[in-house]
């Protein structure tokens, strides 16, 4: 006997969260809970404004239609990426095919005063990997901050993300202020320039490895080994079903590329599932999941060690 619930939710964000030049005041999304006999599976559907093609209203319509079909015996997963991801997670939990083991290590997202960051990063236990957003300020300033961090902490490796913010000139201005002796400790720089060709040229000219992120979701993207390309960053909420995520990870690994499972600012429920996916598909790589602190609450499932208050399922708006 099948049953299902769909919940709508909204979490207040910390002040200062800006995506693609727009302030994100709340994170809006949906949960689906599927039950069959004694088993239960949850999934999160939370399109990311400015990045997802669909809105959460679009996703809600598709999800509710899918749930009614599933209750009638149809299991075909929808095409809409955020719905496909959430539904496939719920089905995987229901079938007990999503392993419970999770990788809760996170590459901390660094912002704020560089001196404070140096103290925080120096005290990090184990492998020191951190992420810095670049491209929000002047490229010269970004280069100076990155250089300062790498100089101060000799065993630090940085993941940088420019979100295609730079022209080739801006990219060169950034690189000019990063000591060539430190550049090998930039694990990768995600999408430095507005076009893939300019990003490839940046990697060749600077010796700084790059990673593809937005490119993975473009229709003409193909997985090929390229000089200067070291990694791909996979955001399942923007990608689609678990099967599609696994296919992309396998394609990257076949080329010797690092695959990083990364957050699209999901709630704690979605983040804990991403931690499980990372442990399953990319066990040797620290995932990019350090986004919970951007929110003011957790929901349904806790992220281990987080002090944020937990909102129980009973407090959510039920749609079905």
UniProtKB/Swiss-Prot annotation:
Q: Name one GO biological process term.
A: menaquinone biosynthetic process
- Top enzyme class, one word, equals lyase
Co-factor requirement = a divalent metal cation
Q: Which InterPro entries match?
A: Enolase-like_C_sf (IPR036849), Enolase-like_N (IPR029017), Enolase_C-like (IPR029065), Mandelate_racemase_C (IPR013342), OSB_synthase_MenC1 (IPR010196), OSBS_N (IPR041338)
> What's its catalytic activity?
(1R,6R)-6-hydroxy-2-succinyl-cyclohexa-2,4-diene-1-carboxylate = 2-succinylbenzoate + H2O
Cross-referenced Pfam families: MenC_N, MR_MLE_C
- GO function terms (MF aspect): magnesium ion binding; O-succinylbenzoate synthase activity
Which residues, by range, are in coiled-coil regions?
A: none
Keywords in UniProt for this one? Answer: Lyase, Magnesium, Menaquinone biosynthesis, Metal-binding
- Binding positions (Mg(2+)): 161, 190, 213
| PANTHER family registered for this protein in UniProt | O-SUCCINYLBENZOATE SYNTHASE (PTHR48073:SF2), O-SUCCINYLBENZOATE SYNTHASE-RELATED (PTHR48073)
Name assigned to this protein:
o-succinylbenzoate synthase
Organism expressing this protein natively: Escherichia coli O1:K1 / APEC
